[in-house]
Amino acid sequence: MKVVILCGGKGTRLGFETKIIPKPMAKIDKEPIILHIINYYKKFGYNDFILALGYKGSIIKNYFKKNKNFLINVRCVNTGKNTLTGGRLLKLKKYLSKEKDFMLTYGDGLTNQNLNKLEKFHTKNNKVATMTIVRPPVRFGEVKMRGNLVNNFKEKPQIRDSWINGGFFVFNKNIFKFLSKENEMLEKEPLEKLSKKKQILGFKHLGFWQCMDTPRDKEYLIKLLKTKKAPWKTR
């Protein structure tokens, strides 16, 4: 099964770094986050990747051109600098024409979910789309007090009563019937239509999930890696 990774956004919230490189090339310790994502998919047997490039996409393309020892197949496709996520996927249609199903995720998120179970869940239920849903981590640590004593502290706890889109999708080929133009976000009209037609399922993941939106997020991921507490690490 092919894996699409959306790599075209500008990632402005990450700060000055993304004025020089695209967000998926921002390093978590010694490796860009895009490689952490790919290595995690490899752990579950997925080796065929399509990278939807946009902003500073040539940097990503050159990285994989120079590093051919990853034992994977990587196709880099320029989907436009300002194209939105739905349009990026639409521009990949010809590269996915022979696929009954394919996976898709964002180039800035990490998890420790079982991707094989995600695929089996999608296949069993036979819907157009399966979306991983996660509990959103709060931005600040949670403190529990007993009098003036800090009784418990948890860095980035999960919010317990809501779910959000965590990426790590599985789509079947009928998703392209819901995409019509390049200036639309996958997460808006297409997924809203799928929801109304009862053609999208949520795969609940209660384990680790973290996107890298801000410098604070990046530092948190680096901290996990350096303290050998990175749940996504495969080696």
For the regions a protein language model found, what residue spans apply to each?
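Active-site metal-binding loops of divalent metal-dependent hydrolases
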Residues: 10, 107-109
